[in-house]
Amino acid sequence: MILASWNINSVRIRLEIFKNWYEKRKPSIVLLQEIKCESSEFPVDFFLELGLKSYIYGQKGRNGVAILVKESLLDESDKITEVNLTDKLEARVIKFFFKRINTTIYNVYAPNGNPISDSQKFSNKIKWYEKLKDLILPYIYNEKKVIIGGDFNVL
């Protein structure tokens, strides 16, 4: 099984690029970040034609994450959850419980905290990471399988 992650920076304008990439590599699961569209505007049919089911947490014009899974791998008890780590509604984290491998997958699009000289922006980023850590630690403590992928905006 291959899992891939891609900050696609506006999914609707990169469909042909995605198709070429996908047909060459054939990952089972794709984590997309910065899809830059509302969930209702996501090109679900395009991905279905490639055999991929789309799980979307979109936001108009910015942010947004999606998880694409080969339809043949899905189970009725798979579960998707939108996760919000701040008081503001920001589509940055989506959680997928994948029954077939008894694993939770998080797709993350972390906030940018640059420049560091903007202490408030950087401070908000660190607080966001603390909340992400609090979300993930129970999996580790309870020895549950978890995959965390995405764009972490490290710089």
Predicted regions and their residues:
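Structured beta-strand-rich core segments of catalytic domains in phosphoester-bond hydrolases
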Residues: 35-38, 42-117
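Active-site-proximal beta-strand elements of phosphoester/diester hydrolases
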Residues: 1-10, 102-115, 149
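Short histidine-centered catalytic/ligand-binding loop motif
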Residues: 116-124
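Long, well-ordered alpha-helical scaffolding segments within enzyme catalytic domains
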Residues: 124-136
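N-terminal, active-site-proximal structural segment of metallo-dependent hydrolase catalytic domains
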Residues: 1-49, 62-65
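Amphipathic coiled-coil/heptad-repeat helices and related helical stalk/stem segments
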Residues: 14-15, 89, 132
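Short, flexible loop segments at the rims of nucleotide/cofactor-binding pockets, characterized by
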Residues: 6-11, 82-85, 123-126
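Active-site beta-strand/loop signature of hydrolases that rely on acidic residues for catalysis
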Residues: 6-7, 22-40, 105, 135-155
